[in-house]
Amino acid sequence: MDGYAQEWPRLTHTDNGLAMDQLGGDLPLDVGFEPQTRARSNTWPCPRPENFVEPTDELDSTKASNQQLAPGDSQQAIQNANAAKKNSSRRNAWGNLSYADLITHAIGSAADKRLTLSQIYEWMVQNVPYFKDKGDSNSSAGWKNSIRHNLSLHNRFMRVQNEGTGKSSWWMLNPEAKPGKSVRRRAASMETSRYEKRRGRAKKRVEALRQAGVVGLNDATPSPSSSVSEGLDHFPESPLHSGGGFQLSPDFRQRASSNASSCGRLSPIRALDLEPDWGFPVDYQNTTMTQAHAQALEELTGTMADELTLCTQQQQGFSAASGLPSQPPHPPYQPPQHQQGQQQQQSPYALNGPAPGYNTLQPQSQCLLHRSLNCSCMHNARDGLSPNSVTTTMSPAYPNSEPSSDSLNTYSNVVLDGPADTAALMVQQQQQQQQQQMSTSLEGQCLEVLNNEAQPIDEFNLENFPVGNLECNVEELLQQEMSYGGLLDINIPLATVNTNVVNSSSGPLSISNISNLSNISSNSGSSLSLNQLQAQLQQQQQQAQQQQQQQAQQQQQQHQQHQQQLLLNNNNNGSSSLELATQTVSTNLNARVQYSQPSVVTSPPSWVH
């Protein structure tokens, strides 16, 4: 009873009430009585008394004591708890050592510090009592599989190829492995201490940048419920930034602060949009448009892509009014001006009344064909109109246009809503002025093109057409004309064109040098009509065709002469070979006749009468 603090209590009576002294002499005592072996599932964990102290293990493994301490001894309790936490491990059937510890002992006990897999199995059976009766093939499949698993899993074991052929590899201890509890290979790709340090430094750098930009950037877009992580995400190392950090959209949020997890933190005030949403009115009192953003918008709207898009829309919207003869000429396209002073001077949006001309273009005029339908253009244009742009529904430059009832309703709604802020109204008027000036000039260009297309072709006079820098690629024209085989007729009654004909050399003509025959230019002194030019072209084509025919005939004649020469050569060779063959045949016949002369029968046959 060395392992117990006190002796087990003695039982005086059994469950049936019989005294233990009465049963002591009747029971046979076996001196060699040993505990019977049980299955592993019933072996551990075994129930132990509360004051049990475990004895020392065979393999010098230590385990903290589970003995309860007195409540007053707090210092000793803390030390025992730390020791128990440090040395605690899962208790196996053979002790506290794991499979990796047993394999380490096996390899370390070898003379050359290396063992094969079969030698490790043998060491387990010989040195660990639990595996002594489990060396056969039936009961060793489980623990042998665990040993193979631990050999390939832990970093402390290293596989070395065996020098002999057909032999298993050696397993050795890795000298570079870290001491203590080994790190599994599967966990090596996960977060390590080095990765944690690097990520921590990156977090600190980002937090410092956020704190530095809170004062300047958070004031630009005020939001009562927005946080730094939601509105001030910077990437200083990004190649996109120039000068300052690249700021993401204020609506962007990280995964941790998504809309689903931070519904109460969303701001009721919309963030600043570079492109306004035409379906909803924009609150200009809560947003500030910088001059850089305004210039970027003006440059974007002045590109050719926007011109083509707006021109297409204007052609669709004003197709009904393109044939009106009473329309005045439209002004050319003028790029938007950036100076604020000029914008205020040229602004048609004054509180007194609208300015005359094209500046009072109404958005309702863009949907003349959609007037009878439920078009969305009407409703989208209502939100961005000022009172001055809505009052005048008929422009003096367009006497045929119809007044719109929708614009009057919109104006009444604006008046009933109350007076707006003067500063916000000025900003809104300036932006609408820029947009409408662009649409007006583009509309004028498109309508001018449509009106020009409506004119008859007879009014087009080439004499009044400026031909100072007019040039024509004659080579492409001639090639296209020749591709039709000379059947294309050009009978357009146009005026004369100043031409300069460059005469070609006296040599043979070809398609490559036809381009040198004519060069239309404004500096020429001779005038030829289009019919004369067509006649010259046909004549040149005929000459070129004749020249090609002559060349083809010459080539054919040369080919025939070459064939005749070949035939003559073949005939000469054939005659000589024929003579030689005839001589050979004649000599053979003579020899045969001489050989067969003695056997010639001179008498007639018997049946001849």
Swiss-Prot record:
Keyword Transmembrane: no
Sequence ranges of Pro residues compositional bias: 326-335
PROSITE patterns noted in UniProt: FORK_HEAD_2, FORK_HEAD_3
Keyword Secreted included in the entry's annotation: no
Localization per Swiss-Prot or TrEMBL: Cytoplasm; Nucleus
Region spans: Disordered: 38-89, 181-204, 216-264, 316-358
Keywords: Activator, Cell cycle, Cytoplasm, Developmental protein, Differentiation, DNA-binding, Growth regulation, Nucleus, Phosphoprotein, Transcription, Transcription regulation
Phosphoserine modification, residue list: 74, 189, 258, 261-262, 267
Any single Gene Ontology cellular-component annotation: cytoplasm
One GO term (biological process): regulation of lipid metabolic process
Biased composition (Polar residues): 62-79, 220-229, 255-264
Residues recorded as bearing Phosphothreonine in the entry: 43
Pfam assignment, any one: Forkhead
SUPFAM superfamilies the record matches: Winged helix' DNA-binding domain
Positions with biased composition (Low complexity): 80-89, 336-349
Any one GO MF annotation of this record: RNA polymerase II cis-regulatory region sequence-specific DNA binding
Subunit structure: Interacts with melt.
Listed name of the protein: Forkhead box protein O
Annotated source species: Drosophila sechellia
Encoding gene, per UniProt annotation: foxo
